[in-house]
Structure formats: C-alpha cells, structure tokens
C-alpha cells in the first residue's frame, strides 16, 4: 500500500484533504485505527460526490459521514480551516511523526522512536543512517521518487514489461496488476502484482522458486533495482523503467505476491479493491450464506461454521455464487 495521497478531481477537494490528514494523524500518532478508517471512508464517499457540498447536514446524508464529521465540515466551510488540524500542525510531535511515516519502511512505532531520539527530518535520518534498517535506507534514498504518483501511461509501460517477461519465462504463469490501476485510475501509488502458477496450490508444498525466478528475471533486465523484502510468497522492492535519451524515469515501489492457483481469483478481487467495495461484497456474501476473504469463498452451514472452499476459476465465479451482478474493475471504486 502506498503512502501517497491520490490527486483529487472532486469539487470537495478541500474537505477530502482535511479528512485524509486527520485520518493519517489518527493512524500514525494516536494509533487509533477505527478513527483512521472512519475518516478514510468519509473522504472516499465525499470524493465521489458529484457536486460541491454546502453544509454538514448535506454531507451527513452520505453513508459514512456521521455527526462529528459533519460538524467539522461545517467549521471548514465557514472558516476555510479546522481548529483541530491547526493545533495538530503546530504540534512538533504530531507533525514530525506524520512526516517520518512518509518514508517507506518507517511505520508509526519506528517514527515515534526516531522522534524520541531527536530525529525529525530527512537530514536527521541521513545523519543517523546507521540506525536505519535496509528497508528504511532504501526508502530514504528514493524518498523524492516514492512521493510522486505514477501516471497511468507509465503503469501501462511497466505492466507490458512484467507480463512479457513472465510469459517468456513460463507461459503457464498468470500475472495481474491490481490496485487502483486495475480500476482505471489515472495515477497509482505503486505497482502491485499478483502471480500464480498451476504448480502451486493451497494443497501443495511451498514453491518459492516460482516467485524467485520471476524476480531474478526482472533483475536481470535491470527493471527491478533494489530488494526490500524477499520471502517465499512475497517480494517487496524497487523498479524503474529503462531510461530514454531525454528522460530518466523515477524509481517506483513494486510488490509481487505469489498466490496458490485455487485462491488466485479471490486474491485478485481483494487486491483490486476498493476497500469499501470489498466490505460491501463480503457483507452481501454473508447475507447469501457465504464467507468471503482474500483466500477463499466458503458456504456457511446452519450452525454458522464455514464449509470447504468453493472451486473458483474467475472473478465472475465469485459474483455468481453470491448472486451479485458482475461488476467490471472500473466500476468498483466505491
């Protein structure tokens, strides 16, 4: 998951901006994930509202906007600012911790530890690089590039390289670029790829070579430039498009997950998102007597105990089982 905020094309950009800022404060400083989720949900719903919101009362009609958020919207619309945010921005602890978490590899706990040691800025991090782990050093090295959104045109170029290399390695591989890119977004925070192969199922032994040989192939062609984490089923790293005569492309974050073939399409559905769409689909599945997660779809018995995973060979199979009309990825940005 990227730490960059998506650009807004909403008539309510000011409202969504302050909600996202409050969300990040609750997650990074207060560690209040429930408040983070509430602010993010409200921001997502308001971002899709087609007209300019004129009052908190109007906003409260939207699912996910409660009385407290509506009050903040009224304050923002009346004054152009929010007292709570002004206070947060003036607080050295809050602003420093929020900033440090923008470095990939630095979570809220590490950010607070660095802050307690007097490390508050990028220069402070550079002067204390011996305290950083490998992941954090790479995050610091490429901080400016990782802050930039990835235009869809660049995502398409990277997708072409990845799919071509994977297919040449073994045509039985299946790879899908997920996230907001698959939903048609004009920009993305990072490259999130799901990978599978018929040799790897939930019943078989682990097959780390299936992931590692793909990573090696992408390293050999100089597309993957750095490794952050490489396990049996997940790779986290850095990639870069080949430089052109008039352009050096930024370094980008890339994640590749190897998923058992029989769980692949539940994974594709989940990692395509959006978060709200996934929650709505899980709720609908429960109403129809199924439990759905990123791994499987299982029928629920009369006692509420889940049965064996159902066979799934496409995303559409999942929609069909739970009797929900299929929605293309571009129609899942709720």
Swiss-Prot record:
Entry EC number(s): 2.7.7.7, 4.2.99.-, 4.2.99.18
GO BP, one annotated term: DNA replication
Catalytic residues as annotated in Swiss-Prot or TrEMBL: 72
Presence of the UniProt keyword Glycoprotein in the record: no
Region (DNA-binding): 183-192
One Pfam family matching this protein: DNA_pol_B_palm
UniProt modification remark: Methylation by PRMT6 stimulates the polymerase activity by enhancing DNA binding and processivity.
Binding-site residues for K(+) 2, renumbered to this chain: 101, 103, 106
Annotated residues for binding of a 2'-deoxyribonucleoside 5'-triphosphate: 149, 180, 183, 189-190
Localisation per UniProt entry: Nucleus; Cytoplasm
Domain of life: Eukaryota
Modified residues (Omega-N-methylarginine): 83, 152
Annotated positions binding K(+) 1: 60, 62, 65
InterPro entries xref list: DNA-dir_DNA_pol_X (IPR002054), DNA_pol-X_BS (IPR019843), DNA_pol_b-like_N (IPR010996), DNA_pol_B_palm_palm (IPR028207), DNA_pol_lambd_fingers_domain (IPR018944), DNA_pol_lamdba_lyase_dom_sf (IPR027421), DNA_Pol_thumb_sf (IPR037160), DNA_pol_X (IPR022312)
Record's keyword terms, sorted: Cytoplasm, DNA damage, DNA repair, DNA replication, DNA synthesis, DNA-binding, DNA-directed DNA polymerase, Lyase, Magnesium, Metal-binding, Methylation, Nucleotidyltransferase, Nucleus, Potassium, Sodium, Transferase, Ubl conjugation
Residues the entry annotates as binding Mg(2+) 1: 190, 192
The keyword Nuclease belongs to this UniProt entry's keyword annotation: no
UniProt: Na(+) 2 binding residues: 101, 103, 106
Listed GO MF terms: 5'-deoxyribose-5-phosphate lyase activity; class I DNA-(apurinic or apyrimidinic site) endonuclease activity; DNA binding; DNA-directed DNA polymerase activity; metal ion binding
Catalytic activity: DNA(n) + a 2'-deoxyribonucleoside 5'-triphosphate = DNA(n+1) + diphosphate; a 5'-end 2'-deoxyribose-2'-deoxyribonucleotide-DNA = (2E,4S)-4-hydroxypenten-2-al-5-phosphate + a 5'-end 5'-phospho-2'-deoxyribonucleoside-DNA + H(+); 2'-deoxyribonucleotide-(2'-deoxyribose 5'-phosphate)-2'-deoxyribonucleotide-DNA = a 3'-end 2'-deoxyribonucleotide-(2,3-dehydro-2,3-deoxyribose 5'-phosphate)-DNA + a 5'-end 5'-phospho-2'-deoxyribonucleoside-DNA + H(+)
Residue numbers binding Mg(2+) 2: 190, 192, 255
Cofactor: Mg(2+)
Family statement drawn from the similarity comment of this UniProt entry: Belongs to the DNA polymerase type-X family.
Description of how the protein assembles with itself and partners: Monomer.
Role summary: Repair polymerase that plays a key role in base-excision repair. During this process, the damaged base is excised by specific DNA glycosylases, the DNA backbone is nicked at the abasic site by an apurinic/apyrimidic (AP) endonuclease, and POLB removes 5'-deoxyribose-phosphate from the preincised AP site acting as a 5'-deoxyribose-phosphate lyase (5'-dRP lyase); through its DNA polymerase activity, it adds one nucleotide to the 3' end of the arising single-nucleotide gap.
Protein name, as recorded: DNA polymerase beta
Gene transcribed to yield this protein: polb
């Amino acid at each position: 998951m990227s730490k960059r905020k998506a650009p807004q094309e909403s008539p309510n950009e000011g409202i969504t901006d302050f909600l996202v800022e409050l969300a990040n404060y609750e997650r990074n400083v207060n560690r209040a994930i429930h408040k983070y989720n509430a602010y993010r949900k409200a921001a997502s719903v308001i971002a899709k509202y087609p007209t300019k919101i004129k009052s908190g009362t109007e906003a409260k009609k939207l699912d996910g906007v409660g009385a407290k958020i509506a009050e903040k919207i009224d304050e923002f619309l009346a004054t152009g600012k929010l007292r709570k945010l002004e206070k947060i921005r003036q607080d050295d602890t809050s602003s420093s911790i929020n900033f440090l978490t923008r470095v990939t590899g630095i979570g809220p706990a590490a950010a607070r530890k660095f802050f307690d040691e007097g490390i508050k800025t990028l220069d402070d991090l550079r002067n204390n690089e011996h305290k950083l782990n490998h992941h954090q050093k790479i995050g610091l090295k490429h901080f400016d590039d990782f802050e930039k959104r990835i235009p869809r045109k660049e995502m398409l170029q990277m997708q072409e390289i990845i799919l071509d290399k994977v297919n040449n390695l073994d045509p039985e591989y299946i790879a899908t670029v997920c996230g907001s890119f698959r939903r048609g977004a004009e920009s993305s925070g990072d490259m999130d790829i799901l990978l599978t192969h018929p040799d790897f199922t939930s019943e078989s032994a682990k097959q780390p070579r299936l992931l590692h040989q793909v990573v090696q192939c992408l390293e050999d062609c100089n597309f993957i430039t750095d490794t952050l984490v490489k396990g049996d089923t997940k790779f986290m790293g850095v990639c870069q498009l080949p430089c052109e005569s008039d352009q050096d492309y930024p370094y980008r974050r890339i994640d590749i997950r190897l998923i058992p073939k029989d769980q692949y399409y539940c994974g594709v559905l989940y990692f395509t998102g959006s978060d709200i769409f996934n929650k709505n689909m899980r709720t609908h599945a429960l109403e129809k007597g199924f439990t759905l997660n990123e791994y499987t779809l299982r029928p629920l018995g009369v006692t509420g105990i889940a049965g064996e995973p159902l066979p799934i060979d496409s995303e559409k199979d999942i929609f069909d089982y739970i009797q929900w009309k299929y929605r293309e990825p571009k129609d899942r940005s709720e």
